[in-house]
């Protein structure tokens, strides 16, 4: 079972990296402009939701919680606090960093 999960993880590694990049882009945009366009925000919410739902399957429960925190920050009325969103995205990235190499 572990070998099968490892193969799936490796196959989808690029997608995980792309998802982190999108979340970082949203956090950077919010920090720089203090705005977040609805299309970018919607894409970031969807991405964080997908990550929260899938990372636990690989035993990355702390990453699941971090992705859920990002999703909740983005998916409430009003803009998230830029510093808080950046901290949450950084935390998710740090948790996943050891698992992102080929």
Label each region the model flagged.
Residues 1-45, 83-100:
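Long, amphipathic alpha-helical coiled-coil segments characteristic
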Residues 38-76:
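Extended, amphipathic alpha-helices with heptad-repeat/coiled-coil or helix-bundle character
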Residues 69, 80-83:
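Sequence/structural signature of long amphipathic alpha-helices
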Residues 24-31, 52, 59, 71, ...:
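A structural signal for long alpha-helical coiled-coils and helix-turn connectors
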Residues 11, 15, 58-61, 77-80:
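Residue-level signal for short amphipathic helical patches enriched in basic/charged
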């Amino acid at each position: 079972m572990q070998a099968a999960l490892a193969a799936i993880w490796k196959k989808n590694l690029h997608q995980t990296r792309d998802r982190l990049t999108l979340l970082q882009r949203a956090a950077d945009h919010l920090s720089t402009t203090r705005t977040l366009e609805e299309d970018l925000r919607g894409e970031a919410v969807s991405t964080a939701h997908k990550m929260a739902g899938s990372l636990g399957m690989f035993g990355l429960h702390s990453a699941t919680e971090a992705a859920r925190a990002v999703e909740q920050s983005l998916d409430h009325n009003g803009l998230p606090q830029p510093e808080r969103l950046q901290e949450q995205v950084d935390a998710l990235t740090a948790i996943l960093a050891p698992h992102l190499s080929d």
